[in-house]
């Protein structure tokens, strides 16, 4: 499975990059905080699960059974975000992933 951690900046679709949008639109499963899932742009799967705890996200990803999954985060995925904890957990499990940062508040 290909896993992408997608930054959504402030949480609005305008905080997505082109690559982040492509990852979301190609995903068969999208995981994240409820408010982020409610703000996903058109063309994204309806297979969405509202989770934010790292251990719960990892468990769901392990049993997902889809080719591509995305986990959405607000904030800056490289600085202050839950993405850091998930990266550490995926690294510890030997699970490959990519990170697509969103538009951060510093850039706005």
Task: List the predicted regions and their residue ranges.
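Class I S-adenosyl-L-methionine
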Residues: 1-108
């Amino acid at each position: 499975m290909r896993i992408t951690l997608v930054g959504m900046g402030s949480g609005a679709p305008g905080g997505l990059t082109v690559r982040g949008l492509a990852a979301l639109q190609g995903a068969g499963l999208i995981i994240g905080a409820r408010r982020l899932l409610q703000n996903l742009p058109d063309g994204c799967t309806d297979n969405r699960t509202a989770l934010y705890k790292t251990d719960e996200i990892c468990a769901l990803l392990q049993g997902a059974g889809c080719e591509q999954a995305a986990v959405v985060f607000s904030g800056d995925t490289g600085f202050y975000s839950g993405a850091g904890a998930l990266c550490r957990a995926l690294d510890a499990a030997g699970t490959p992933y990519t990170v697509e940062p969103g538009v951060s508040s510093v850039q706005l």
